[in-house]
Amino acid sequence: MRLFVMGATGHTGTQVIDIALARSHDVTAFVRSPQKILRRDPRLKLVAGDPHSIEQLTKALPGHDAVLSALGVRPPQAFRPHTLVEECAASTVAAMGESGVNRLVLVSAAVLFPQKGMLFALFRTLLRHIARDLRAAEDVVRSTSLHWTIARPPRLTNASDGAYRAVRDALPAKASSMSFRAVAAFMVDAAEQGTFIRETVGLAR
């Protein structure tokens, strides 16, 4: 497959590249700063671009089988009002429509599930700006006719374990955390297998 990775310099995006290359896929990393990616591989193509730019995305996308988006906002901006993921989701789906690419796997967050309890209420308060941006991005994606999958993982860690559980429209039981690598594995699996089409998926270790 030819996979188009957005957010490729982040923790999850880096793991997506590693897993996809290990499975002999061709990977395009669409990033603002290609020099931040130290990995070199004949199957890896680095493309400099702005994820807000429909024009740049439309130029880079043709010929790919799927878009895997791990875009997110890092602290301290993550704890302030922002719309980055929503804006980039809008430009991405527009460019996909122009380019004839139909498959999208997007990372969101488990905080959007209506879980009960004080801990989840606290997370929803602390992560309210992230949640607002991600929910808006999800709405953008759902409004399209694309074959999308939205992944909602819980707290992410740097563990090397790539195992995960996936549940439609709910957080798996006893979900507390999972690794960036496991989220990346789910994304590549979903792209390869064509699973969870037009579905929201809760993830956990």
Sequence positions of predicted segments:
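Conserved Rossmann-fold cofactor-binding substructure of NAD(P)-dependent oxidoreductases
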Residues: 45-65
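Conserved beta-loop-beta element that borders a ligand/cofactor-binding pocket
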Residues: 138-159
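SDR active-site strand-loop-helix element
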Residues: 6, 30, 70-71, 104-110, ...
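NAD(P)-cofactor binding segment of oxidoreductase domains
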Residues: 69, 76-104, 132-136
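Substrate-positioning beta->alpha
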Residues: 133, 151, 178-188, 199
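N-terminal Rossmann-fold cofactor-binding loop
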Residues: 30-35, 50-51
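N-terminal Rossmann NAD(P)H-binding glycine-rich loop of SDR-like oxidoreductase domains
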Residues: 3-23
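Glycine/proline-rich active-site loop of Rossmann-fold NAD(P)-dependent oxidoreductases
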Residues: 160-164, 190-199
